[in-house]
C-alpha cells in the first residue's frame, strides 16, 4: 500500500490508512508499506549490512538462503530499524501496546544462485488443537534493502494462509511446519515484488518460501521479530548487551526492548 509523504515524515499513519493496514494484515497476513524509507538511508544500511554478511561467510557467498545478525551498535541500532514508527503503530493496533522484541535481530538473504526453499511457516498456531486461528502473537517486520523482483528472489507468500489451521499429522510433527507443493496448490500465492525501502509487517504464521536469486546481487532484507506480551519473558531470550547504546535509543525502542534495560539486568544478577 502507498503511504503519503506526510505520514512518512511524521512517522504516523492517519486513521484511514491505519484501518486499511490492520485489515490487510488480519485478512491476508501481511501488508507492504512501499518506499517509506529514503534511498539514501537504504543505501547506507545496505552497504553496512552486506559488509557484515560477507564478513560472516568469510568472503565466500554460499548459494543458499540464509542471513545473520549484525553487531548491535551504531547504525544497526537506528530507530527506523528496531522500532520503525509506522510498523510499530500497526503492530500495537493488532497486538496491543505492550509488544516486545529481542536483540540481535536478523536478516533474510537470498544469495546469488540460491535455490527454491520449502513452503513453511515461521511460527506455529499457539493452540493447534483449536479449529480456528487466534489473533497474531508473533509478527515480523521486514525492510527491503534492494528492489525485490522475481529475478532476484522476491519471497513467495500465500495470502490468508495464516488463518488456515494445520490438521495433518505430518505438518504438525514437522519442526518447520512444512507444506507440500500439492497441499499449498489449493491456495493462491503471490510474489512480494516491491521497491527498496519498503517495510513489510507480516503475521509469522503465513506460509511463504524463499525463491531463487538469478542475479549477481545480494538480495537482503532486515527481519525484526515482535511478540504479543501475554507471558513472562522467555528464559531463552538472547542476553545481548546494549548498555553502551541504551541512552541513545528512543523512548519507544527502550519500551519494546525493555528486557535489555541495563539497570534491570544488573538488578537480576
Region locations from a protein language model:
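Short, conserved beta-strand element in jelly-roll/cupin
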Residues: 128-150, 193-196, 224-228
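Non-heme Fe(II)/2-oxoglutarate
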Residues: 2-3, 8, 59-60, 86, ...
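Generic beta-strand structural signal
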Residues: 98-105, 115-117, 137-143, 153, ...
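Non-heme Fe(II)-dependent double-stranded beta-helix
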Residues: 2-27, 34-130, 237
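Double-stranded beta-helix
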Residues: 148-209
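Short edge-strand/loop segments of extracellular domains
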Residues: 109-110, 158-165, 225-231
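Short acidic/polar capping segments at secondary-structure boundaries
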Residues: 107-112, 123-124, 145-150, 161-164
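Active-site glycine-rich loop that binds ribose-phosphate moieties when present
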Residues: 121-129, 143, 177-185
Amino acid at each position: 500500500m502507498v503511504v503519503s509523504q506526510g505520514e512518512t515524515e511524521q512517522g504516523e499513519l492517519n486513521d484511514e490508512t491505519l484501518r486499511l493496514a490492520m485489515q490487510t494484515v488480519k485478512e491476508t497476513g501481511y501488508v507492504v508499506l512501499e518506499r517509506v524509507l529514503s534511498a539514501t538511508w537504504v543505501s547506507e544500511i545496505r552497504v553496512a549490512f552486506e559488509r557484515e554478511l560477507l564478513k560472516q561467510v568469510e568472503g565466500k557467498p554460499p548459494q543458499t538462503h540464509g542471513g545473520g545478525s549484525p553487531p548491535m551498535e551504531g547504525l544497526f541500532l537506528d530507530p527506523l530499524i528496531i522500532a520503525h514508527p509506522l510498523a510499530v503503530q500497526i503492530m500495537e493496533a493488532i497486538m496491543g501496546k505492550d509488544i516486545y522484541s529481542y536483540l540481535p535481530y536478523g536478516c533474510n538473504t537470498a544469495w546469488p544462485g540460491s535455490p527454491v526453499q520449502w513452503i513453511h511457516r515461521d511460527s506455529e498456531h499457539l493452540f493447534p488443537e483449536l479449529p480456528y486461528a487466534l489473533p497474531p502473537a508473533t509478527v515480523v517486520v521486514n525492510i527491503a534493502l534492494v528492489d525485490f523482483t522475481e529475478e532476484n528472489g522476491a519471497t513467495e507468500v500465500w495470502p490468508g494462509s495464516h488463518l488456515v489451521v494445520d490438521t495433518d499429522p505430518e505438518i504438525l510433527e514437522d519442526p518447520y511446519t512444512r507444506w507440500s507443493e500439492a497441499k499449498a496448490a489449493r491456495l493462491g500465492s503471490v510474489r512480494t515484488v516491491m521497491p527498496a525501502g519498503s517495510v513489510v509487517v507480516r503475521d509469522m504464521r503465513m506460509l511463504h518460501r524463499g525463491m531463487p536469486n538469478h542475479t549477481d546481487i545480494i538480495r537482503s532484507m532486515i527481519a525484526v521479530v515482535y511478540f504479543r506480551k501475554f507471558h513472562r519473558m522467555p528464559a531463552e531470550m538472547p542476553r545481548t548487551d546494549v548498555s553502551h547504546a541504551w541512552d541513545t535509543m528512543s523512548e519507544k525502542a527502550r519500551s519494546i526492548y525493555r528486557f535489555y534495560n541495563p539497570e534491570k539486568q544488573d538488578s537480576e544478577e
